[in-house]
Regions:
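Short alpha-helical patches at protein termini and domain edges
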Residues: 1-179
């Protein structure tokens, strides 16, 4: 339960070592075994791995195909990140969106590095055989990236209709360019 509170409230791992928190735990139970920040970190990581495994199993069990959005994002700090989100319809016909990966992606973004990262994400989640389409920003490097991924997946016959529906351009990005 403590690991869930740390995640939910974005608390540091050493929260469990705060003197006031330790006193509260001791007050509630004199026999409590106090844990360290390393134990707290290990517990959070264990919970993450369990949740990730649950999501993997869920993605494997859904009857529908999975659509992806991929975003390369640069906040004001000039750090760069890559975000891969899965979208699917569950067995109750509810649209579900799950961020699968969000990680640091230092510049530059050469095509080979980006492709390797994306293909590793797909393999890691075990969804290569379930893809329907991917939405990317309109950029020439994204077109090249999408073409290569489509070619790679089509070699194994993994895409519907030979992948003609595989690349969907980002409508919001296009509208923003028009405005």
């Amino acid at each position: 339960m403590l690991d869930e509170a740390i995640i939910k409230h974005n608390l540091p791992f050493n929260f469990v070592e705060y003197e006031g928190i330790r006193r509260v735990f001791s007050y509630l139970n004199l026999d409590v075994k106090q844990i360290s920040k390393n134990t707290s970190k290990a517990d959070v990581l264990k919970l993450y791995k369990k949740e990730k495994n649950d999501v993997k199993n869920k993605l494997k069990s859904i009857p529908s195909r999975i659509c992806l959005t991929l975003d390369l994002w640069t906040p004001v700090t000039s750090e760069r990140y890559i975000c891969l989100t899965a979208h699917y319809v569950d067995e109750n016909w509810k649209l579900k969106n799950i961020i699968l990966n969000f990680c640091h992606m230092p510049p530059p973004h050469p095509r080979t590095l980006l492709l390797e990262k994306i293909l590793n994400f797909l393999e890691e989640w075990g969804i290569v055989k379930k893809l329907f389409f991917i939405t990317l920003y309109n950029a020439s490097n994204n077109d090249n990236c999408q073409d290569f991924i489509k070619k790679k997946l089509n070699e194994g016959g993994l895409l519907l209709c030979d992948g003609i529906f595989f690349h969907v351009r980002c409508g919001a990005y296009i509208l923003n360019l028009i405005v």
